[in-house]
């Protein structure tokens, strides 16, 4: 097997069945990091293993979609926002149809600052990225909810006029879509939006 077929965490060789399940049969770690939620329980050394593995993949194929996303998510989780933006920007350039690039770049673009204290230019840039993600992946409600949370925290909390669609309209539009509560919660946490926010994933009792 090639290097790309080795678990980044334990070095175990995996087969197509394990890849379909996205889980190493030996250590049960995710083989591909496609969501920041996969990194929730990993410490820095474990995340560095994913970075090392995907760096090797990118040396052979600089436009590998999975590796670019994984690198962006690992650096995002580590709070290294400039590096996260670099790889997510490369992902968007190489795969402009991939909604995840826009979604995570929007989150990282605030550099760990709460939307309420960000600049208007930063908010507008994040909004545009999230609107693009909604267009590309309309069935995934995470884009709608995170955009609603950003607009509520910046515009409403600062007493400013709210652009359309409003946070309420965005939440209503997310009904019936796929909602991953953990994924949404991780996204809000990376933007320092408090758990007391009306857009806390605890509001979404059912995943669809």
Report each predicted region and the residues it spans:
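Short coil turns that delineate tetratricopeptide repeat
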Residues: 19, 62, 96, 138, ...
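Terminal, low-structured helical/coil segments at or just beyond the last alpha-helical repeat
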Residues: 157, 163-208
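Short coil/turn linking the two alpha-helices of tandem helical-hairpin repeats
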Residues: 79, 106, 110-118, 148, ...
């Amino acid at each position: 097997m090639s290097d790309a077929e080795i678990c980044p965490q334990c070095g175990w060789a995996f087969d197509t069945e394990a890849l379909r399940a996205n889980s190493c049969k030996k250590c049960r770690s995710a083989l591909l990091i496609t969501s920041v939620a996969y990194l929730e329980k990993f410490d820095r050394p474990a995340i560095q293993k994913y970075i090392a593995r995907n760096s090797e993949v990118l040396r052979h194929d600089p436009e590998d979609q999975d590796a670019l996303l994984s690198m962006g998510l690992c650096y995002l989780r580590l709070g290294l926002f400039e590096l996260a933006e670099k790889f997510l920007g490369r992902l968007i350039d190489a795969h402009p149809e991939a909604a995840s690039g826009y979604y995570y770049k929007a989150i990282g673009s605030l550099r760990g600052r709460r939307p309420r204290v960000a600049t208007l230019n930063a908010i507008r840039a994040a909004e545009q990225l999230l609107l693009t993600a909604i267009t590309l992946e309309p069935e995934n409600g995470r884009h709608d909810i995170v955009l609603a949370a950003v607009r509520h925290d910046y515009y409403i909390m600062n007493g400013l006029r709210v652009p359309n669609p409003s946070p309420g309209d965005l939440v209503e539009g997310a009904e019936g879509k796929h909602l991953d509560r953990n994924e949404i919660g991780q996204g809000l946490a990376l933007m320092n939006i408090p758990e007391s926010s009306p857009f806390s994933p605890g509001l979404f009792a059912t995943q669809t």
